[in-house]
Design a protein with these regions (language model features):
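C-terminal ends of transmembrane helices
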Residues: 38-49, 93-105, 169-179, 219, ...
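N-terminal signal-anchor module of multipass membrane proteins
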Residues: 1-36, 275-279, 291-294
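Hydrophobic, membrane-inserted alpha-helices
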Residues: 6-12, 62-71, 167-171, 184-193
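Alpha-helical transmembrane segments and their membrane-interface exit regions
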Residues: 31-40, 86-99, 209-219, 278-284
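Membrane-interface helix-loop-helix junctions at boundaries between adjacent transmembrane segments
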Residues: 49-57, 61, 68-129
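N-terminal membrane topogenic signal
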Residues: 1-5, 115-116, 240-241
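Long hydrophobic alpha-helical segments that form multi-pass transmembrane helix bundles
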Residues: 103-173
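Predominantly late transmembrane helices and immediately cytosolic-facing juxtamembrane segments
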Residues: 96-101, 197, 206-236, 243-244
């Protein structure tokens, strides 16, 4: 629903304000990113026992250390760091969607027409990540974030578009064969978001209103408080029990971004620093959630 609303809002704003005006795009993107940031902070709740304070401290220290190293690496090697982030995000988002759908099948007791994960995982990841970065509006959007990223694809934008198209066709064919028509709608919705909305909004809305929501929904199955509320039929309480513990990460991320922006040695936009932190957090987040993903995918 949020994705559909974002598509409509973008189309309306593009007509009334203008597709080249980035002010409204940055505002929506920052809000969507803010919605998504807390979900990554919940990793330690499902990885380390909170009763073991020493293990928790070590975990948080290593988590922050890895994320901090990633931030510095991206700031130093903008293009290479961005390319690695694109690849990692593609894999992480694709696996995350596939894991969510498998968990949903398990909860509904669906044993037939299983998700053809091998044929859809890259499509679910590449459509929301790659397509927005190679459309006609990406140049001005990336220039607004960081001019070094404008030619991140090194001239292979058409080749990347062709690869994503092939992945999309293969995924749709596999879903038709397995009669998973609801998942085809998901792919079409993601494609519409990537094609019809500006790049900044496409990525941010996907991250905050699609990936983060699905990841949080999966966490309600493993967080004790959420699981208890779910078993009592209190779905909304179960969801919020998985969301609220991660909100300090939201404030921490923006405080860190503001600090880098104000006291940094280089002249970058606030939005660039926010994105850098979000991308950097993907590194430890992806490593930690691998165990949860393997279980969902039965690997």
């Amino acid at each position: 629903m949020a994705v559909a609303m974002a598509i409509v809002a973008s189309l309306v704003a593009s007509q009334l304000i203008g597709s080249k005006d980035l002010s409204w795009q940055v505002a929506i993107a920052l809000f969507a990113l803010a919605v998504g940031i807390p979900h990554g902070a919940l990793d330690h709740f499902v990885t380390v026992q909170r009763t073991n304070k020493k293990s928790m401290f070590v975990f948080i220290f290593v988590y922050v250390l890895v994320a901090g190293a990633a931030v510095l690496a991206i700031l130093k090697w903008n293009v290479l760091g961005f390319q690695i982030v694109v690849l990692m995000s593609l894999v992480h988002f694709g696996v995350g969607d596939s894991a969510f759908l498998n968990e949903l099948d398990r909860l509904k007791g669906i044993s037939s027409s299983r998700l053809p994960t091998a044929f859809v995982v890259l499509a679910f990841g590449s459509i929301p990540v790659v397509l927005p970065l190679i459309n006609s509006l990406s140049t001005s959007a990336l220039a607004q974030v960081n001019t070094n990223l404008v030619n991140w694809h090194q001239g292979f934008d058409e080749s990347l578009r062709a690869i994503v198209l092939v992945l999309f066709i293969v995924a749709v064919a596999a879903l038709i064969i397995t009669k998973r028509f609801r998942d085809i709608i998901d792919l079409l919705l993601l494609t519409a978001l990537a094609v019809l909305t500006p790049p900044l909004i496409a990525f941010a809305v996907y991250f905050g209103c699609w990936h983060a929501m699905r990841h949080t929904a999966r966490l309600t199955l493993v967080l004790p408080e959420s699981l208890s509320a779910y078993e009592q039929g209190k779905a909304l309480k179960a969801f919020w029990s998985a969301v609220l513990p991660g909100t300090p990460a939201l404030f921490g991320a923006f405080i860190l971004a503001a600090g880098l922006w104000i006291y940094g040695n280089v002249d970058k936009s606030f939005f660039w620093f926010v994105l850098t932190i979000v991308w950097a957090l993907t590194v430890p987040h992806m490593i930690i959630t691998a165990k949860l993903d393997r279980k969902a995918l039965r690997i």
